[in-house]
């Protein structure tokens, strides 16, 4: 496993961790190319922020290496749209994207309180109720709410 981060936040002894340093040419693009020479099983890229990084991540993925990264977006469809906005072609994205895991920050008491109140009791209806409240308050669109709801 090779990680490319800016900065390396948590040191992991069982991974090769590379940190960006653009002042000496250590960009995402350069470090991704460098890491491909090592043929890792998994490549973790800190964040896709620009066209150069998006293209490099897609190239790495198309070599058959499993690549994980983050993209800031407001919804699952927004992730897809954001990658297309960064110059990745529809065909490239269709050939390399295996899935999207999406998380939303929850306002209020915090994640631990929310998880204890809702998930430990396996209460999907509580989650769906909260999604409905967020929709009613204008924090979610109809599309986002439908994507977030837990289906039976």
Residue ranges of predicted features:
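Short, flexible helix-loop junctions that flank or precede catalytic/ligand sites
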Residues: 1-152
